[in-house]
Amino acid sequence: MAPPSVENGSDTSTAKRRRIALACNACRLRKSRCDGTRPSCSSCVSLTLDCQYEPGESAANVIVRKQYISDLESRVYNVEQVVHRLNYFFEGHLSACATATGNATVTAAAAQSRLPRIPSPPAPSSSALEETNDGSHPHATGLEEPQDEDATTNGMAMTFVEEHTSAFFGGSSNINFTRLLLKAVNNIRNPARRLGATVDQQHELSETNLAKASRSYTNPVAASPDTGPKAMTTLPPAQEMDRMLDVYFKTAGTVFPFIHEESMRKTYTTCKASNWTRVRRTFLGTLNVIFATIASADQDAIPSARERQERSNIFFKRATALCSELSKQVISIEIVQYLVLVVIHCQGAQRSVQAWNILGLAVRSAMALGLHSAQAREGLDELQAEYSRRTWVVIYCMDKVLSVAFGRPAIIPDEYMLDQPSSSSEVAMPTPDSAGTGVDIPGDFLAVSFRLHQIMNGSLRQQYGGNVHTAEPEPDDMMSLQASGQLRKELRAWSASLPPYLRLCEPKAKIPSENTSVNRLRVILTLRYHNINMLIHRPLLCSTIRHLFLGGNSVSIDNSSYIIQLAMGEAHESLRSAQHTIELVHTIIKADPSGSNNLGVAYFTLHYVFTASLVVLGRILWAQHGQGAAADETALAMCKSLLGQVETIFQLLDHDNSLVYSCSRYINNMLEVCTAQDAIVAVQNAESGDSSAHQPPSSLAAKQLETMMHLGMGDMEMFQAYSSQIYDPALSEGLDTSSVEAATARNTDWENSFWAM
């Protein structure tokens, strides 16, 4: 018999079915054919069964399609990006979810260490620039400093608990003056409490100067997406970098002239010409801090403060990734200048705690480098020696500014500054502004600023006890008068010695409205002058308020009436400076609300205006309740007019700025409290001996003071820039127990919502 034909067999044969390496659980139990489709096979879909794949012990060599792995990686990457964006935008904004957000951040970070990441495109070896996905941002390659290795996961599935912070604020801080105003308001409402007010006054001051209620620590920079080796070397387009450098040296680089522009631009041009193949890590970090500072302050480029801060955080995170650890291990002039730039940036970016801590590191590094010693600079060439000296002077000035703001002891004594020249003309350096004039305008500005901050330091030592003790120095009206008189003479002598092109300006003059770099320096000097004048005369205003509302001063008994009258007369000097500050800023911002006006950075303007507003509020309290039954209507009208100008300033100063909104809201609430009508009734009743003076105040005043107390416990971050995180429930210690109990129930939610700004 002939064998069967191959052709006949081929007609009846069928194609082999594809072998499935792993069948789903349902098909294996039913012993049916499984097509292996993920996530659900066709059989399970048709039977509406739950399709699950569980590899057995023999499935170690199961082959999974590459496309499936790629899809999983893509999905995980997208989820991670969404989580990062949510954490970045909403951490601190959803107060009720603060704990959950922190845990989500840790969980997401742990998940990233375990899950595979989509590999980034490899950098071409022949190109010096690494492009991002859109190809628009270059990357610096070939960093000369060794890159710090990231810490590896310890495998313990550790979850960090919340960190808490508390702080000390001394007599020069705004929080101290605000406490005094609130205590005075409380005593106006409750005259009977004056009898026992002085018994525990010293103990109360000692306790309230410490922020006893801690708050959880959140870092807005840490909440942003991770900065990897590639991200931290990313640079904006060359045109954008050129623009930001130009803006820096025209603004901040003139106010703080400690970086030589020509040398900086030469290094920048060299790195750019070499496609950033070789660049010092410190230089790249310094460049990013400059970009962060300009990005946060350039209102003309981005009107919204929130958007500017988001963009600024990107540059700041790159800078810290590059130089944060390096600055603790290496000492060089570039590292010191980097730290000074970080202090300036943090002070203007509502990171006051970072500014204070990093300033300490900058001072130590500068001393280790010998910047405080003229002999150590003798071996340097003239240019290096001059800019080393300028760096030390800027550190000294920042030390005094932060010491006043925080109410804490200064680090650098005046004995370390004896070798500073009396005029910058002795060491004049050529600058673009001085071309053809032979005058180093930034150098002269730094020299006169240095002498002004020396007067500020004298006020700290003589009037505020150097902010050394937890309590205010024992108030002595005679010593306060003598100190303020001497410091006022020094301040006026400083003003008279200014060069003609840096003379102080008046609010009604034409100079503030003419936008030039020199006029901007004059306006800044004028604002600094009046701010220090308020600092010098504020102790006299405090003595007046204590005498009128807090039972007077037991120390100055002899001739107390005469001394108090002198103190009251001198206290008006602080109000005059507050008036000049508000009117000057109001005139400039009404004429030109753009970021190119003569005010400079909005943050520092906000600081000066807010400090002046507190002085005006003190004068309102004095005029409304401090001189018998009749209020000083003339002074009240003038002060309320000034606060009306302050409200206009806050509206025009910046857009979408939560700190400005908070300042405006706080001033308005303080004004309501200080002008409460029932307080007058309380004073009148107390003077007439009416027993009703000891009865609880009206519901209106109780509500206002409850609101103020409530703001004191939660709505106080507006002080962070200059009072250094004023958050302190001690502001409410002198208020009625009923008000405290009424607000306690709502305190937590309000506190969290405000701190989330």
Swiss-Prot record:
It comes from the Eukaryota. Transmembrane segments: none annotated. PROSITE patterns: ZN2_CY6_FUNGAL_1, ZN2_CY6_FUNGAL_2. Pfam families: Fungal_trans, Zn_clus. Keywords: DNA-binding, Metal-binding, Nucleus, Transcription, Transcription regulation, Zinc. It is found in: Nucleus. CDD domains: fungal_TF_MHR, GAL4. InterPro entries: Fungal_SecMet_Regulators, Transcription_factor_dom_fun, Zn2-C6_fun-type_DNA-bd_sf, Zn2Cys6_DnaBD. Transcription factor; part of the Fusarium detoxification of benzoxazolinone cluster 1 (FDB1) involved in the degradation of benzoxazolinones produced by the host plant. Maize, wheat, and rye produce the 2 benzoxazinone phytoanticipins 2,4-dihy-droxy-7-methoxy-1,4-benzoxazin-3-one (DIMBOA) and 2,4-dihydroxy-1,4-benzoxazin-3-one (DIBOA) that, due to their inherent instability once released, spontaneously degrade to the more stable corresponding benzoxazolinones, 6-methoxy-2-benzoxazolinone (MBOA) and 2-benzoxazolinone (BOA), respectively. Fusarium verticillioides possesses 2 unlinked loci, FDB1 and FDB2, necessary for detoxification of antimicrobial compounds produced by maize, including 2-benzoxazolinone (BOA). The FDB2 cluster arose as a duplication of the FDB1 cluster with rearrangement and expansion by incorporating additional genes. This is Transcription factor FVEG_08294. It comes from Gibberella moniliformis (strain M3125 / FGSC 7600) (Maize ear and stalk rot fungus). The lineage of its organism: Eukaryota, Fungi, Dikarya, Ascomycota, Pezizomycotina.
